[in-house]
């Protein structure tokens, strides 16, 4: 199946803060010059929601009001899939694990083997949904992104 690159894809992004109260610092990466989406730009860790993110067994529940806010006026991936995607993308792009040591039930969803091999299960409890942004028309790739702290 060929994917329509111009279709708006659901995505999840994590804003990682350190020393929030005294001297805040944020974690960002710079995209490559050849990237189709936002080349050379500094971005937060994140990316598209994959189908298998909906099957990820989160170790903790998504807290309210985060779960309710993620579901408002939204057709598309579940709150669970959005949180799982945020956690997966954070791990893939930075190596940071948002999880607790625990065994995974079999089978581990595709795309999650590296995370599971570390002996951790993803936890959504620390995630705080901040805002939603849709890439404007005219870009080569468009995303309907949810941003988490």
Name these PLM-found stretches.
Residues 1-149:
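N-terminal leader/linker segments that precede catalytic domains of diphosphate-processing enzymes
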């Amino acid at each position: 199946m060929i994917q329509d690159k111009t279709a708006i894809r659901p995505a999840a992004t994590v804003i990682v803060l350190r020393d929030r109260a005294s001297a805040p610092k944020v974690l960002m990466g710079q995209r490559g010059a050849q990237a189709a989406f936002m080349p050379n730009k500094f971005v937060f860790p994140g990316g598209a929601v994959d189908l298998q993110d909906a099957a990820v067994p989160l170790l903790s529940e998504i807290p309210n009001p985060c779960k309710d806010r993620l579901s408002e006026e939204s057709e598309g991936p579940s709150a669970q899939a959005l949180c799982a995607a945020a956690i997966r993308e954070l791990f893939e792009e930075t190596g940071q694990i948002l999880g607790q040591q625990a065994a995974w039930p079999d089978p581990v969803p595709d795309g999650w083997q590296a995370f599971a091999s570390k002996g951790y299960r993803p936890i959504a409890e620390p995630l705080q949904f901040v805002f939603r942004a849709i890439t404007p028309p005219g870009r080569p790739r468009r995303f309907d992104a949810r941003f988490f702290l």
